[in-house]
Regions:
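Gly/Ser/Thr-enriched, mixed-charge loops and adjacent short helices
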Residues: 26-35, 143-270, 275
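Short acidic, glycine/serine/threonine-rich loops at helix termini
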Residues: 89-94, 119-123, 141-147, 228-233, ...
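N-terminal small/polar loop signature for handling phosphorylated ligands or for N-terminal nucleophile
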Residues: 79-142, 239-296
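Phosphate-binding and adjacent anionic-ligand microenvironments
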Residues: 277, 281-283, 304, 324, ...
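Conserved phosphate/anionic-ligand binding catalytic regions in large, soluble enzymes, centered on
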Residues: 31-51, 136, 221-229, 233, ...
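An N-terminal, well-structured beta->alpha segment
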Residues: 2-95, 101-102, 185-215, 225
Length: 545
């Protein structure tokens, strides 16, 4: 890669400022690596070189995508949404120009939008594809591109691999010439307001009404896209008992008022807690910057805050959906393979079928696509705070979940109960399955090697017992094999390949997987055992020592 040529083109790259703030190692990585279009699209840091996001690598991606779309169908169409991050607007315009150059009709909004509305818009406008420009909850110097198929789900693995090949065939991004003509820009159309209206109507119909109680809510968008749509939605449902964390409900690509724009991180709630204490609020809700994930916390009468993890929120929402859909037959819940044993136990107890899929909401969307006319999907979720109640969206959707959780909490409040009370009742009914996640960040090329080494070592040395827990089976989703230790047999897993190892016990499971979007390796634990916290810490220390 011609580093000198890249530096000469820095002024045109849109990212010169970011490049100049990077360390020597970070700068070098941009020239020594390449962005790859994977199953979750592309996500990375800004900077120079083919390993970073900049004007030229975005043009390369857009050109490859244009060729892919034109090869798939005649007269393709696409809708593009973008969040509040640095360069999201600029990247959206670049991609729109490239696609328009290839006679692809592009629907482009004049302001930021949420990820779930993009999924809805693809279906509503009946476009060939969709693009979401976001890096979700990553730090401020990241952005990314997610591509959606015509059913509103993220691209399948096979389609992603094909798009990746088209992108690679483009070659050197510095050699791309994108002429702009008035004739071509006529292919770029304004995004219809009717789509947003229809999206809100679907949620309004799903919720019905929120019962009158004295529930008080604090809401924060963490500087992201869920404002103004969430406040407008709540008001349309005649729910006005909420306060916004005003400082965090303004779009800010630097996420200035939060240490972490991630609802999984309790620090994201710091200002919400302050406001809740002042306003004596009961329920605190935060959404991540692109509004596909949400976190909740609850404040009791003494000012004590209870934070709920993604699995606990999933259990609460599943419990509520089971109550709401008692008249339906053939009910189905879908969750990822690293999500809790608690929700599976709750589904079994209530005669609700459940399915497990690989991590990534597109695999949940694939299951939804394959439902027959008799099946009723009542809930889907991932432990990473992604939830879906009704499938008019084919990705996780915090916007539809906010009023749902408020309605649930309002009903409980009428009976003098809380979400914490309800969770305790679930534990008493199906058992106290507890969950935790250890996430280890290992950045750069060295970090990537370390992650690979950990996975290889774990595969080469499969355990028979861990901290007194007897291993029943080991599932390796990379080889699509499950080894039953008690029977000494190996069988196939009917699932796409993925770099995940899951160890099963009578008490639950642990799972190990590298993140697909961040330089992290994650250890998941879902167990019903005494001294859970101590056992979890010891297993984490054993694997990562």
């Amino acid at each position: 890669m011609d580093k000198e040529l890249w530096i000469k083109r820095a002024n045109d790259s849109l990212v010169k400022h970011f490049y100049e703030q990077q360390s020597d190692i970070e700068q070098r990585e941009g020239f020594e690596s390449k962005l790859t279009f994977g199953t979750a699209g592309i996500r990375g840091k800004f900077g120079l070189g083919e390993g970073r996001l900049n004007k030229f690598t975005i043009e390369k991606l857009a050109l490859g995508l244009a060729r892919y779309l034109n090869a798939q169908t005649n007269n393709p169409t696409i809708v593009i949404h973008y969040d509040i991050r640095h360069l999201s607007t600029e990247f959206a315009q670049i991609i729109a120009n490239v696609l328009a150059n290839h006679q692809i009709i592009v629907y482009l909004p004049d302001t930021y939008k949420t990820t779930p509305e993009l999924s809805f818009a693809v279906r509503n406008l009946n476009t060939t594809a969709g693009i979401m420009i976001t890096a979700s909850h990553n730090p401020k110097d990241y952005n990314g591109i997610k591509v959606y198929s015509s059913d509103g789900a993220q691209l399948s693995t096979d389609a992603s691999e094909l798009v990746s090949r088209y992108i690679e065939e483009v070659g050197d991004p510095l050699q791309i010439d994108i002429p702009i003509s008035k004739q071509n820009t006529s292919y770029i159309k304004p995004f219809p307001k009717s789509v947003t209206d229809d999206y809100m109507k679907h949620i309004q119909n799903m919720i019905g009404y929120i019962p009158k109680s004295d529930l008080q809510v604090v809401f924060t968008s963490l500087h992201g896209t869920s404002v103004p749509i969430v406040p407008e939605l709540l008001k349309s449902l005649n729910f006005n008992q909420f306060n916004l964390v005003e400082a965090q409900c303004k779009p800010d690509p630097n996420f200035s008022s939060v240490q972490s724009a991630n609802p999984e991180d309790h620090r994201a709630f710091d200002q919400a807690v302050e406001l809740a204490n002042k306003s004596h609020a009961d329920l605190l809700i935060s959404t991540d910057p692109d509004a596909d994930r949400l976190g909740i916390a609850e404040r009791d009468a003494h000012g004590h805050i209870t934070y709920f993890n993604g699995n606990q929120i999933g259990a609460l929402l599943l419990n509520y959906r089971i109550q709401q859909t008692s008249q339906l037959r053939h009910r189905l819940m879908i969750q990822s393979i690293v999500s809790s044993e608690l929700t599976k136990s709750l589904a079994r107890y209530n005669n609700v079928e459940y399915k497990e899929v690989l991590t990534g909401f597109k695999f949940i969307a694939q299951e939804i696509r394959q439902l027959d006319d008799h099946q009723n999907m009542i809930f889907a979720f991932e432990e990473s705070y992604g939830f879906l109640s009704e499938p008019f969206v084919r990705d996780k959707d915090a916007v539809q979940i906010v009023p749902l959780i408020i309605k649930y909490a309002s009903e409980l409040k009428l009976y003098g109960k809380t979400l914490k009370d309800e969770l305790e009742q679930i534990y008493q009914t199906v058992g106290r399955h507890e969950d935790t996640l250890f996430s280890h960040t290992l950045e750069g090329l060295e970090g990537k090697k370390k992650i690979e080494s950990i996975m290889t070592h774990f595969r080469s040395n499969p355990p028979q017992e861990i901290q007194g827990l007897k291993v029943k089976a080991i599932e390796d989703y990379l080889t699509s094999e499950v080894y039953q230790l008690d029977k000494d047999t190996t069988s196939q897993i009917d699932s796409p390949k993925s770099n995940v190892i899951r160890v099963l016990f009578d008490e639950g499971f642990i799972a190990l997987r590298p993140s697909g979007t961040e330089p992290k390796i994650k250890l998941y634990l879902s167990l019903k055992c005494p001294d859970f916290d101590d056992v979890a810490q010891k297993i984490n220390a054993m694997i990562f020592s």
